[in-house]
């Protein structure tokens, strides 16, 4: 079921991208968008996890190097009926974690040195359960493709804008639409793409919280961890790329600007409240 959902979303986002390309650039725009969509989906599927791990200097560790962390990941992966993911550690004081990998067979769990320092074993289990839920649901692949397509739509709109400014339009020859429609799509399409990306990311965070709590065995493990991580991430800066912020369990960016309205993460208070309500039903 999760594989089917992933495929459907990939197709939907790609078709939307091609549709935007056709409205902005006619047949040539649609063709260009199709080629870009195929290339980006291929690249995101096979290489995105390697890039993000290298971006943060993550180092793979063995059981001998991080026995407690490794034991937690292995035990919870078995409980979730997942293959053992690779375990990585990021040298960063900000307590945070993320999962990556295109499928459960290629799963990776990465945690910072900071998170291992401030969380108890139970809280760390809550975090690992959350990340394993992302792997089980193939959320990382979906989020990566959504972010890639959203960025590409913005790029396509910018290209079209500069082409109109410096090159004019030849709609009759190229099969493009009305110039006003194209102009509106240049403005609206990136916003629509961003909203789709945020909706996908936020809904999947809630689902990973709930399923991760079940994997860990107690929703309060994760709710307590989130409370600590939220305040620590605000106090301890991390040199994080905004394009990968959606991958982390809590937003690694400061979030003290208007961009907080467009956060890829649901409000931390709501996440904690949901988990505490879940704990009362246990």
From Swiss-Prot:
Where is the catalytic site? 131
Subcellular location per UniProt equals: Cell inner membrane
Entry note: cofactor:
Binds 1 zinc ion per subunit.
Q: Where does the chain cross the membrane?
A: 6-26, 29-49, 140-160, 180-200
Per the record, the coiled-coil ranges are none
Q: How does it sit in the membrane?
A: Multi-pass membrane protein
* Binding locations of Zn(2+): 130, 134, 205
The EC number on file is 3.4.24.-
One GO MF term attached to the UniProt entry = zinc ion binding
> Pfam families from the xrefs?
Peptidase_M48
A single GO BP term for this record reads: proteolysis
- Cofactor or coenzyme needed: Zn(2+)
Keywords attached to this entry:
Cell inner membrane, Cell membrane, Hydrolase, Membrane, Metal-binding, Metalloprotease, Protease, Transmembrane, Transmembrane helix, Zinc
Xref: InterPro entries: HtpX_protease, Pept_M48_protease_HtpX, Peptidase_M48
Which family does the UniProt entry place this protein in? Belongs to the peptidase M48B family.
- Protein name per Swiss-Prot or TrEMBL: Protease HtpX homolog
